[in-house]
Amino acid sequence: MQVSVETTQGLGRRVTITIAADSIETAVKSELVNVAKKVRIDGFRKGKVPMNIVAQRYGASVRQDVLGDLMSRNFVDAIIKEKINPAGAPNYVPGEYKVGEDFTYSVEFEVYPEVELTGLESIEVEKPVVEVTDADVDVMLDTLRKQQATWKEKDGAADAEDRVTIDFTGSVDGEEFEGGKATDFVLAMGQGRMIPGFEDGVKGHKAGEEFTIDVTFPEEYHAENLKGKAAKFVINLKKVEERELPELTEEFIKRFGVEDGSVAGLRAEVRKNMERELKGAVRNRVKSQAIEGLVKANDIDVPSALIDSEIDVLRRQAAQRFGGNEKQALELPRELFEEQAKRRVVVGLLLGEVIRTNELKADEERVKGLIEEMASAYEDPKEVIEFYSKNKELMDNMRNVALEEQAVEAVLAKAKVSEKATSFNELMNQQA
């Protein structure tokens, strides 16, 4: 076997391989012997068919199969010998083949980039220092009460946290537009569902009033014909409702799994959940900064084959989220996922190099801790932990999470890490 390697462009490689004629003939004869042992031909007992007849009947297909097998095996031998690490599936380009002659073919593929990590000492990470205060717990309790609130009709004017029922008709330059009209539309104020200025125009009005408001569609509005356009909405306000928050009664508190039904018990449970969320948020915030710094400090080429593979993964995930199938996933435009896919590949390659150079292996104690932390959010943590322990795929996924955390910590060990006092609300809003 003769082998030559050339760089086509960037990470592209072409390996040209020549297989000696005698190697091909030896392999063909060997395979024909195997065929002769199995084949049945009228007039001959199984295994007793003359080789010339076997060769005449099956020689062409056997030779084709042998060539395909030799091409694959010799390519593997070649990349091992040349210490090449292909990324993605190789493209075989067969040359002209004549029986009795050497056979030359080429294989085109991309290789993984050679990554040499630099600039870790220049990475700057700001670690949030946060504690859950009594005031934070008060806000969360208020949020829980709002989620369980009922609505009661009121006579007064609509304000920022009310719910209104309206009819409206929108127009641009005196002409109604598609999607600009609704009847008995229920709008919970303060959630930002409508275009800027709409809710402000409703505030201060009472049920039974009809009025007109002026608004401007944002430049980034999804409908091309309405972007940046001034519009008028004629609104008939039919009903105004205000929230009635439930009292912190024993019955209400027990809905959240607090068995003793006490306010103190609820506050303790809420604080515990907030602290768990906080721990994850701090970890994610630090991790995202470390990875961002790692990416900025290390500009690497990325094999297009890996990007293509990641795009397929993202397409399928998107289709699953919206109830689509395999065919619909493949029809989603490549451009929607290309940037995210490239980013994920880059991060994977860089963290992989961190893991390799630091000789990291998943810490089983960390894996156990991650599973316990995740399970604590469920009603029966022991059941969740047992489920994970019996599922190899889930355990492997959690080991990957742990290994990634360890890689990030290795980056942080060399980075410039400072601390910044932050409120719970500020940090959680950054995560949103």
From Swiss-Prot:
Q: Where in the cell is it found?
A: Cytoplasm
Its domain description in UniProt is: Consists of 3 domains; the N-terminus binds the ribosome, the middle domain has PPIase activity, while the C-terminus has intrinsic chaperone activity on its own.
Any one GO biological process: protein transport
Q: Name one GO cellular component term.
A: cytoplasm
Q: What is this protein called?
A: Trigger factor
Question: Which Enzyme Commission number(s) are listed?
Answer: 5.2.1.8
Where is it mostly found? cytoplasm
Q: Which superkingdom is the protein from?
A: Bacteria
Q: Which residues form the PPIase FKBP-type domain?
A: 161-246
Write out the similarity annotation.
Belongs to the FKBP-type PPIase family. Tig subfamily.
Which of UniProt's keywords are assigned here?
Answer: Cell cycle, Cell division, Chaperone, Cytoplasm, Isomerase, Rotamase
Q: What does this protein do?
A: Involved in protein export. Acts as a chaperone by maintaining the newly synthesized protein in an open conformation. Functions as a peptidyl-prolyl cis-trans isomerase.
Q: Which reaction does it catalyse?
A: [protein]-peptidylproline (omega=180) = [protein]-peptidylproline (omega=0)
- List GO molecular-function terms, semicolon-separated: peptidyl-prolyl cis-trans isomerase activity; protein folding chaperone; ribosome binding
Q: Which Gene3D superfamilies match?
A: 3.10.50.40, Trigger factor ribosome-binding domain, Trigger factor, C-terminal domain
